[in-house]
A protein has these predicted regions:
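N-terminal nicking endonuclease/strand-transfer module with a His-rich metal-binding environment
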Residues: 1-150, 154, 158-168, 172-267
Length: 267
């Protein structure tokens, strides 16, 4: 079972502290500190803290504004299916990590990837990453930068005339350099969109099947219904069918099977 999360500037701090088990007073009472040594990381080893690397990566990409509600980081939580034999655990999480890296731009966008084994229930992977999309730099900025590289002594009047753009635009970009031309941008909206969410479980299942890892993370429910139904929605549907009678035994049985799959961490 997998679920997606998005984190604004303030939520990033608590999330990274949580996954690294550095929160002094964690809200999650299910954490057994005596088992925390069993947790492990799949993220690349770096000489930077997670916060330092996040800042470094954000400096490399275009960010439209600094609003408080912008999502600076996204994340997936993937839980090991109950029926998966323990000997496949590390291979399963490594495969999930590789799948996520391939899907979201590679290791350079990974902030953390921690497998937790110190909570109740099955082990699970917290995969946190910067949602990076393709960016098309401002055309006039590129023009000004390239022109001034070739004509460093040109004044604003000359640049305006030869480039065919306004004097205001030349002044705006005059002090920019190649570092300001960014072909990547921060955009959780573009990366974690409806199509991505709807295809996620099925794509992950195909990847695991290709590696012959006997884990079920997709049952076809998403495809059949156009989106995952919550446990509460399924229970309400089942109870409605039972209450109103009719030949609904098979339908109720099907819904019960789906609920069992939720309980087992399959979907």
């Amino acid at each position: 079972m997998a679920s997606n999360q998005k984190f604004n500037k303030h939520a990033v701090y608590n999330q990274l502290k949580h996954v690294s088990r550095e929160l002094k007073y964690p809200k999650n009472i299910d954490i057994d500190k005596n088992r925390s040594h069993l947790n492990y990381s799949l993220a690349p080893e770096r000489n930077l803290t997670e916060f330092e690397y996040l800042k470094k990566r954000l400096d490399e990409i275009y960010i439209h504004s600094d609003r408080q509600d912008i999502n600076y980081m996204s994340g997936w939580i993937i839980t090991k299916p109950k029926e998966l034999p323990d000997e496949y655990e590390e291979k399963f999480f490594r495969a999930c990590y590789d799948f996520l890296c391939n899907r979201y731009g590679g290791d350079k966008n990974v902030i953390s990837a921690d497998v937790h084994k110190d909570e109740s229930g099955e082990p699970h992977l917290h995969f946190c990453f910067v949602p990076v999309a393709q960016n098309i730099p401002n055309e006039n900025m590129v023009k000004v930068i390239n022109y001034l590289k070739e004509n460093p002594d040109a004044n604003n009047t000359k640049a305006t005339k030869e480039l065919g753009i306004s004097r205001k635009t030349v002044r705006r970009y005059r002090n920019c350099t190649d570092k300001d031309i960014k072909y990547e941008k921060l955009s959780a909206k573009d990366v974690i969109n409806k199509a991505d969410l709807q295809s996620f479980h099925q794509d992950l299942q195909k990847y695991l099947d290709k590696l012959r890892i006997p884990a079920r993370v997709y049952t076809g429910i998403t495809k059949a219904r156009g989106g995952n139904m919550t446990v509460q929605q399924l229970k309400m549907q089942r109870n409605h069918l039972i209450e109103h009678g009719g030949n609904v035994d098979e339908i109720v049985k099907t819904i019960d099977n789906i609920l069992n799959e939720f309980d087992n961490g399959i979907i």
